Amino acid sequence: SVPGAEAGDRLITRGALESGGLAAADSEALIVRTLPNEASKRTRDWSAGPLPAYFTREAMHAIVAAGIEHLLVDSPSIDRTHDQGYLTGHRIFWGLEDESTDAPRRPEATVTEMIFVPDSTPDGLYALSLQVPPFATDAAPSRPLLYPLESV
């Protein structure tokens, strides 16, 4: 069965996302910046030290229910580092059942991992240029660019 959270795991929960305004957002993309937001994230050896934060199943279901098509995170995976290959968060995001090898139900949805958003970039609404090359594969590099939106 799908492994659950273990003592000491750092979780990104549905409640945390809702506290951050997920339910009120009318956006296609969501950027999640975990704390502490240290510049060392850019060069960190993620296999050393404590495991990085990851999304709970409930958090992933909330993201899908909110209509998020593009999820960008500052950790190496939306799933627990040692999840025995289940990739539960990825499967939920793309609309796949556990252990399914079917084509995703949300083929246009994207996950971008290991981004870095400095503290000098305030929380808020941005236009996102994701810039993903047209590779026919399950993973491709992306270059997300954010442009602040101003109310008129």
Task: Walk through the language-model features, giving the residues of each.
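Active-/binding-site microenvironments in catalytic and ligand-binding cores
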Residues: 1-152
